[in-house]
C-alpha cells in the first residue's frame, strides 16, 4: 500500500477530473489518498464540500493552522504520515518534502504538461 499526497489549489482545482479518476483508482487498489492543503482549518466545511463537488474521494484531509509555513507544514504531514508520492503545484513545497518522497510537479507556466498519467500509474503500481 502506498500513501499518496495531493494538494488542492493549483493541483486538484486545475484538473479535477484527472485527480478524481486517480484518487478513485488508488483507493480501489487499497492505497491511501491524503489531501494535504495549506487552506486553514476554518475552511474545512467549505473544502469538504468542494472535494465532494469535484468527486474526489480521500482517506484523510490535512489542513494548516494559521501559524504554519506552507512548505514546512506539508513536509511535516508527509513525514508524519509516511507519504510515498506527492502531487503539488508548488515547487517550494515539493523541495521541502522528506527524502524518499516521489514528487510530481503539477504546474509550471512554461511547461504544457507534466508526467504522463501512464508513467504515474506505472510508478504507483510498482512494488505492490
Regions found by a protein language model. Name each.
Residues 44-128:
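C-terminal cap/substrate-recognition subdomain and adjoining C-terminal extension
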Residues 2-69:
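Alpha-helical substrate-recognition element adjacent to the catalytic core
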Residues 1-3, 82-83:
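Hydrophobic/aromatic side chains embedded in well-ordered alpha-helices
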Amino acid at each position: 500500500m502506498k500513501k499518496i499526497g495531493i494538494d488542492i489549489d493549483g493541483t486538484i482545482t486545475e484538473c479535477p477530473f484527472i485527480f478524481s479518476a486517480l484518487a478513485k483508482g488508488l483507493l480501489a487498489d487499497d492505497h491511501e489518498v491524503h489531501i494535504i492543503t495549506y487552506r486553514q482549518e476554518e475552511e474545512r466545511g467549505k473544502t469538504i464540500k468542494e472535494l465532494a463537488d469535484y468527486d474526489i474521494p480521500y482517506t484523510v484531509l490535512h489542513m494548516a493552522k494559521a501559524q504554519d509555513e506552507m512548505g514546512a507544514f506539508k513536509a511535516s504531514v508527509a513525514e508524519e504520515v509516511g507519504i510515498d508520492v506527492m502531487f503539488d503545484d508548488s515547487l517550494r513545497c515539493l523541495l521541502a518534502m522528506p527524502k524518499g518522497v516521489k514528487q510530481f510537479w503539477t504546474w509550471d507556466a512554461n511547461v504544457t504538461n507534466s508526467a504522463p498519467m501512464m508513467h504515474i500509474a506505472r510508478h504507483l503500481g510498482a512494488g505492490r
